[in-house]
Amino acid sequence: MSTSKRKRGDDANWNKRTTKKKPSSAGLKKAGSKAERPSLQIQTLQHAGSTMITVPSGGVCDLINTYARGSDEGNRHTSETLTYKIAVDYHFVADSQACKYSNTGTGVMWLVYDTTPGGQAPTPQTIFAYPDTLKAWPATWKVSRELCHRFVVKRRWLFNMETDGRIGSDIPPSNASWKPCKRNIYFHKFTSGLGVRTQWKNVTDGGVGAIQRGALYMVIAPGNGLTFTAHGQTRLYFKSVGNQ
């Protein structure tokens, strides 16, 4: 009998012990810094119609972190910005001159960081210092040895285009068919982890002349003289940091 009473007493004492409560999921989310982190700002650059990009032999270089001063989402709110991610969506269309010939070419797109832009955007030849004999072969280009402290290639992507001596509006004869070729291609890239810090002068515009340090360029060059136009958009994800 005594043994059974002790068991009941032990059971009662065990049930009276306080158990630690697990923290609720709501408490964890509240304590976490990620939940309070502000979302990234977005700027979209559209190129279509009159604003399409013409890509000649030798390439083209455009500033893309063009954050003008203002209060909108795509504006910089402070004197410093950080660009984290970029999404690139374009259709590359071979121009009428390139379509006259049967050709294939490997083109290149770069994202190039410029530590000290100096008031104007450089040309692709300034960045890569290629000789005229390599103008048609951008896959062989390297950053100039003398300017490697200024220009840093953040990303490099290759793409292939083709022409067959015909333009897209040509109609084959009724007793023949033409194989499709890559005279019109879709080019998509999404990249993160860029960490491009830009320091701005005390001006309101977002041009290269407003940048004190840290410009970001998109450089595109056609391969083997297969020139084209680019139609689409670039989307940049960034933050305004530092002092106002």
Curated annotation (Swiss-Prot):
Motif (Bipartite nuclear localization signal): 1-24
Domain of life: Viruses
Pfam (any one): Gemini_coat
GO MF annotation: an example: DNA binding
Main location: virion
Record-level GO BP terms: symbiont entry into host cell; viral penetration into host nucleus
Record's keyword terms, sorted: Capsid protein, DNA-binding, Host nucleus, T=1 icosahedral capsid protein, Viral penetration into host nucleus, Virion, Virus entry into host cell
GO cellular component assignments: host cell; host cell nucleus; T=1 icosahedral viral capsid
UniProt-annotated stretches for the region Disordered: 1-39
InterPro entries: Gemcoat_MSV, GV_A/BR1_coat, Viral_coat
Compartment(s): Virion; Host nucleus
Family statement drawn from the similarity comment of this UniProt entry: Belongs to the geminiviridae capsid protein family.
Function: Encapsidates the viral genome into characteristic twinned ('geminate') particles. Binds the genomic viral ssDNA and shuttles it into and out of the cell nucleus. Plays a role in protection of the genome from degradation, virus acquisition and transmission by insect vectors, infectivity, and systemic movement. The CP of monopartite geminiviruses is absolutely essential for virus movement.
Assembly description: Homomultimer. Interacts with the movement protein. Binds to single-stranded and double-stranded viral DNA.
Full protein name: Capsid protein
Naturally occurring in which organism (per UniProt): Maize streak virus genotype B (isolate Tas) (MSV)
